[in-house]
UniProtKB/Swiss-Prot annotation:
Protein name: Protein PB1-F2
Any Pfam family: PB1-F2
Note, other: Is not encoded in all strains, and seems to be dispensable for replication. South Carolina isolate has been sequenced from formalid fixed-lung tissues of a 21-year-old male which died in 1918 at Ft. Jackson, SC. Brevig Mission isolate has been sequenced from lung tissues of an Inuit woman buried in the permafrost in a gravesite near Brevig Mission, Alaska. This sample was recovered by John Hultin, retired pathologist.
Domain of life where this protein originates: Viruses
UniProt subunit comment: Oligomer. Interacts with human SLC25A6/ANT3 and VDAC1. Interacts with host MAVS.
HAMAP family reported for this sequence: INFV_PB1F2
Mitochondrial targeting sequence: annotated span: 65-87
InterPro entries found in the cross-reference section: Flu_proapoptotic_PB1-F2
Residue stretches of biased makeup (Basic and acidic residues): 19-34
UniProt site positions, description: Important for pathogenicity, S is highly pathogenic whereas N is low pathogenic: S66
Main localization category: host cell
Keywords: Apoptosis, Host cytoplasm, Host membrane, Host mitochondrion, Host mitochondrion inner membrane, Host nucleus, Host-virus interaction, Inhibition of host innate immune response by virus, Inhibition of host MAVS by virus, Inhibition of host RLR pathway by virus, Membrane, Modulation of host cell apoptosis by virus, Viral immunoevasion
């Protein structure tokens, strides 16, 4: 079997040090520049993915709060289609 020291996980931890927070706890801090950039990129990507979903939910919530005749008709038709589809498949 190979030695544990050869695994990429063990080698990659060499880039991590700790920093003290205000409450005295220590948290890991990435010192490697590429790792920090990667984390920033992932955070930005996640924000771009989550934002449209939040907008859709917000619009749905607004339409429920003050429905217009058109939005009510759309909701009823969608429900009816789903119900009909379910009836045909079961």
């Amino acid at each position: 079997m190979g030695q544990e020291q050869d695994t990429p996980w063990i080698l990659s931890t060499g880039h991590i040090s700790t920093q003290k927070r205000e409450d005295g706890q220590q948290t890991p801090r990435l010192e490697h520049h590429n790792s920090t950039r990667l984390m920033d990129h992932c955070q930005k990507t996640m924000n771009q993915v989550v934002m449209p979903k939040q907008i859709v939910y917000w619009k749905q919530w607004l339409s429920l709060r003050s429905p217009t005749p058109v939005s009510l008709k759309t909701r009823v038709l969608k429900r009816w289609r789903l119900f009909s589809k379910h009836e045909w498949t079961s």
